Amino acid sequence: MAQTLVEKIFSKASGKEVKAGEFVMANIDLAMIHDITAPLAIKAFREILGSDAKVWDKSKVIMAFDHQVPADSVHAAENHKMLRKFAEEQGILNYDVKGGIAHQIMVENHVEPGMLIVGADSHTCMYGALGAFATGIGSTDMGFVLAMGKLWFKVPESIRFNVHGKLEKHVYGKDIVLKLIGMVGADGANYKACIYSGEVVEKLGMSDRLTMCNMAIEMGGKAGIVEPDKTTLEYLKAMGRPYEGELLKSDEDAEFQEVELDVTGMEPQVAAPHRVDNVVGISEVEGTRVDQVFIGSCTNGRYEDLKIAAEILKGEKVASNVRLIVIPASHREYRRALKEGLIEIFVDAGALVEAPCCGPCMGGSFGLIASGEVSVSTSNRNFIGRQGSPEGKIYLVNPAVAAATAIYGEITDPRKIK
C-alpha cells in the first residue's frame, strides 16, 4: 500500500499500517510545554492521575519559559515558580528562561525525522521542517499525554505544495508561505498536513524551511512538513547530533492534493491587517507609515534572518518615528549573532535588542503598540490586538522588508535600496 510520509509516521506510532482518515491511538515521541500552557496541562494531568503522579516518561517531556520572560507580573512569577517545582519533582528537562523560544529549542536539541511530536502551542508544526510530524494540542490533551504518553488522532490527508521557479532578491521562505496562505485561505488546509516540495524548497536552507512549516497552521494545517533530505542531515550534524536512522519518505505513488506555485518574478509578500491570508505584494502597501518594527519570533528570529536584516541596517539609523525591536529566537542564535557582529550593528542603528523570548509576538509582555499605531513584524499572526491595542495594525513581512522599513519609517521594498 502506497503511503505518504504522514501515514508512515502514524503507522510507526500506532503499530499498524494506517491510511488518511483512520482514527488511531498513537504513541508520542516528544511533548513540549511552556510557561503559558503548562499550568493548565499540569492541572489536567493531576486530575487524571492524582497530585503525586509521575509523567509517563520524563525523558520525553521538555519545558521552556518563553512567553512571559523575564516574568512581567507577580502572576507570571508565581507560574514560573510552580513550573520549576513541577519540573524538579518530575525530573523533566526544563530550559527555564535560559534557552529561548521553545520551538527553536526543540529543533536545535530534540527533534528528529520520523518522530510524532505534540506541543501545547499552535506553532509546534514548525518541527516538521526536520521531517517529523509535529502538531499543537490543547492543555487538556497535553495533560492526558503527560499521563499516558499517547493520544488519539485522525490521520490527516496531505496537501503537497509544489514550489517552482526562481526567487527574486530579498524574497524568502516567508514570502513563499505567505503567498500560499493567500492562495488557499486561512482554512484552505484544515486538518491537512502541508507538505512543501519542488525544486525551490529543495534549495532552501533550514531556516527558511522552519519559517514555512511554522506558518502551516495559518492556513489551517495540522502540520507543516519538508520531507527529510541532505539539508536535514546537515542541519542535525551542525546542531551536534548527527542522525543515522531511517529517513521515512512518501512513496512515489502516494495520494496527495496538489497545489502549484511558480515564484518567478514574485515580489516580497505582505500579510495586511487583520488576517494572515490578507496577502498582497509589497507594491500595494509601500509607503504605509510605521511606528514599530519587530524582527524576531519563532518564525524569523534565527541567525539567517538576523543576518539578512543586519546587512541592510549596517551603517544606517532607525527612522526617528520608529521603534525597532530585535529578538533572537534562542541563546544559540543570539551567541552566533553576537560573535559575528550582528548585535553591534543593530545597537548602532538604534534598535532595542532583547533576550531570546516571544516578545511582542504574543502581545502580553513588552513591545506593545498603542491605538492607531502600525507594527511591521516578522512574526506569524496579525490578528486584531495581537501585539497590543485592538485599534493598532500589524503587517507581516520578511526580515529584509522589516529592516528596510525601520530605516525609512514606512513600508519599503528592500530591492529598491542601493
From Swiss-Prot:
The keyword 4Fe-4S applies. Its EC number is 4.2.1.33. Binds 1 [4Fe-4S] cluster per subunit. GO terms for molecular function: 3-isopropylmalate dehydratase activity; 4 iron, 4 sulfur cluster binding; metal ion binding. One of its GO terms (biological process) is L-leucine biosynthetic process. Pathway: Amino-acid biosynthesis; L-leucine biosynthesis; L-leucine from 3-methyl-2-oxobutanoate: step 2/4. Pfam families: Aconitase. It catalyses: (2R,3S)-3-isopropylmalate = (2S)-2-isopropylmalate. Keywords: 4Fe-4S, Amino-acid biosynthesis, Branched-chain amino acid biosynthesis, Iron, Iron-sulfur, Leucine biosynthesis, Lyase, Metal-binding. Coiled coil: none annotated. [4Fe-4S] cluster binds at C298, C358, C361. InterPro entries: Acnase/IPM_dHydase_lsu_aba_1/3, Acoase/IPM_deHydtase_lsu_aba, Aconitase_4Fe-4S_BS, Aconitase_4Fe-4S_dom, HAcnase/IPMdehydase_lsu_prok, Homoacnase/IPMdehydase_lsu, IPM_dehydratase_rel_enz, IPMI_cat. The keyword Amino-acid biosynthesis applies. Its cofactor is [4Fe-4S] cluster. Heterodimer of LeuC and LeuD. NCBIfam families: hacA_fam, IPMI_arch, PRK00402.1. Belongs to the aconitase/IPM isomerase family. LeuC type 2 subfamily. Catalyzes the isomerization between 2-isopropylmalate and 3-isopropylmalate, via the formation of 2-isopropylmaleate. This is 3-isopropylmalate dehydratase large subunit 1.
